[in-house]
UniProtKB/Swiss-Prot annotation:
Known pathway: Secondary metabolite biosynthesis
InterPro entries given in the database record: HotDog_dom_sf, PTE-AB_protein
Top-level lineage group: Eukaryota
UniProt keyword list: Virulence
Organism: Lecanicillium sp
Name of the gene encoding the protein in the UniProt record: vlmB
Keyword Chaperone set for record: no
Function field: Part of the gene cluster that mediates the biosynthesis of verlamelin, a lipopeptide that exhibits antifungal activity against plant pathogenic fungi. Verlamelin is a cyclic hexadepsipeptide and is bridged by ester bonding between a 5-hydroxytetradecanoic acid moiety and a carboxyl group on the terminal Val of amide-bonded tetradecanoyl-hexapeptide D-allo-Thr-D-Ala-L-Pro-L-Gln-D-Tyr-L-Val. VlmA and vlmB are altogether regarded as essential components in the biosynthesis of 5-hydroxytetradecanoic acid.
Extent of the signal sequence: none
Gene null: resulting phenotype: Leads to highly reduced verlamelin production.
Protein name: Verlamelin biosynthesis protein B
Amino acid sequence: MEVKKLEFIGPRVMPGGQKEMDYFCQVPEFQQRCQSGNAVVIPRRDQVADGRGSTGKLFSQTLNTADTIPHCIVMFEDTYTAQSSTQPWLPISTCSVFYQLGEGVCGFGNICHGGIQTTLLDDVMGVLGVLNARLQDGIIPSKVPGAYWPRNNPGMVDLTKSLFATQGIEVKFLRPLRTPQVIEVSAQLVDMDVSGGSFTVQCVIRDMKGKQYAVANANWVIHTPRPRSRL
């Protein structure tokens, strides 16, 4: 009897992401998340040296071992819609990072340490900012060429020449997060200050069945370097 394979409509995979994509596609729930034609996948540990911490040693070395976080990948939806709002806004408002957690991130027994969970929550919030900056800069090509250039979008906050950092974060742990397992950490833009100088993000840790383990709310500030005055 011939077995018909279901056609897999995968996401757009950015350079360097295929190896991690192949790994996570072994997880059925991840495959389901990839069915959207707007999904874009990029490596969390990449080689783009744009000074935004994406290749910092915490994730590229310290947590990049077989028993800590051997695999991780970023996913977001490229669903560009032209806006004419004069209120501050960003190209994408949500993203997810999938992590394979090993036993080396545990603080007691097989329970992931709360400090590691907080680090992951903060990390994904930062990834959301980096994705927006790279879409604006064209480092990540958009489905519609030039769609996310700030000069073409009134009210869009330009992150291409800005630095952004956590100002404050509040974390609530809901239940023990056991390892090893694959988790999804999702960040959602909640609000932007009317001045465009800060934004609020909510982030959630879930297992691949959708159960929540930790929730964080954080304020992020945007630092735009002032032009040097001429003597």
